[in-house]
Amino acid sequence: MALPPVYIVSTARTPIGSFQGSLSSLTYSDLGAHAVKAALAKVPQIKPQDVDEIVFGGVLQANVGQAPARQVALKAGLPDSIVASTINKVCASGMKAVIIGAQNIICGTSDIVVVGGAESMSNTPYYLPSARSGARYGDAIMVDGVQKDGLLDVYEEKLMGVAAEKCAKDHGFSREDQDNFAINSYKKAGKALSEGKFKSEIAPVTIKGFRGKPDTVIENDEEIGKFNEERLKSARTVFQKENGTVTAPNASKLNDGGAALVLVSEAKLKQLGLKPLAKISGWGEAARTPFDFTIAPALAVPKAVKHAGLTVDRVDFFELNEAFSVVGLANAELVNIPLEKLNVYGGAVAMGHPLGCSGARIIVTLLSVLTQEGGRFGVAGVCNGGGGASAVVIEKIDADAKL
């Protein structure tokens, strides 16, 4: 049975800031609202009161405040009547938000849905668990919220990077393989930046100056400019001291950012005279043993491709979130994705990985790739802690449509 079409009519994202870097003064809701405002500004036919709901991803929610997605919506100027849902599927949160938004349109409960995700990893607090019951005597332990709720496998009680080391060993990828993948990610991202490939998707952020200092406009992803090939090759391994392969430079970083997409039904597309950028053709989700989350996209991507009525060889470009270089390498090998079709503008190793944002960000970038490099079908996939993964297939509708 053919499903009713769901169209992407606008996308936008913030630049991605480094940990404690250029965007660290902004909260989750600041980052999300900026992306939402920018996406809606590109489609003036859609008035704030026309938007039925917002579905927004966010992982590190401690101290963010009640109902984070609702905060994003109201800060972006959407009306009090907006229905808001916050999604936490770890790194796949932003993509799950896109899937839910599309499903709601297909079900007929909404016609216009703003979807996406954000994360301010810089502002995630430390926890003091013993304070609730009273730390009556002696030292009290502080818990890093980023690590506890974002980067730690709760079943093995080991960091995500240890799982990446397991993946490298299981699939035979060396330190050199991962370093070369990371170097290529940085070089592709640097080339895309220098050629202006990200301009259509990035909404520059103005950071207010203080104590007489001028405002600062952040226009580019902060991590890309930090690339140093020699330092990357000489970096120490982080998660496994002896015979380890995963380093800080060949893994994604801790980051801040937000991304948003505007989805509409076919009826609303025609009623408002909107020009579609792409159609959401299918999606797939899968899960396996929690500590093997790194290769869960190898299950989700084929499911999404099948759901869209395609085969992998018909897909023009792929975006796989580079939580670690080995994630890109292993899943490309398992799904038979040619590396020349993968992350052609670089990935999270070079650009950064704000957890709740990334699943939406890679769809935004995938659409940029399809638009500027001449493709029709694209697949975005992302693994998530706990053993899961999500994937989305999009089809470029109009080669002349501008982002």
From Swiss-Prot:
Keywords per UniProt: Acyltransferase, Peroxisome, Transferase
GO CC, any one term: mitochondrion
Active-site residues (renumbered): C91 (acyl-thioester intermediate), H353 (proton acceptor), C383 (proton acceptor)
GO annotation, biological process: ergosterol biosynthetic process; fatty acid beta-oxidation
Residue interval(s) of motif Microbody targeting signal: 401-403
Enzyme class: transferase
One Pfam match: Thiolase_C
Localisation per UniProt entry: Peroxisome
Single Gene Ontology MF annotation: acetyl-CoA C-acetyltransferase activity
Catalytic activity: 2 acetyl-CoA = acetoacetyl-CoA + CoA
Pathway where it operates: Metabolic intermediate biosynthesis; (R)-mevalonate biosynthesis; (R)-mevalonate from acetyl-CoA: step 1/3
Major subcellular site: other
EC number in record: 2.3.1.9
Keyword RNA-binding recorded: no
UniProt-listed InterPro entries: Thiolase, Thiolase-like, Thiolase_acyl_enz_int_AS, Thiolase_AS, Thiolase_C, Thiolase_CS, Thiolase_N
Subunit structure comment from the entry: Multimeric.
Family: Belongs to the thiolase-like superfamily. Thiolase family.
Name the UniProt record assigns to this protein: Acetyl-CoA acetyltransferase IA
UniProt organism field: Candida tropicalis
Gene: PACTA
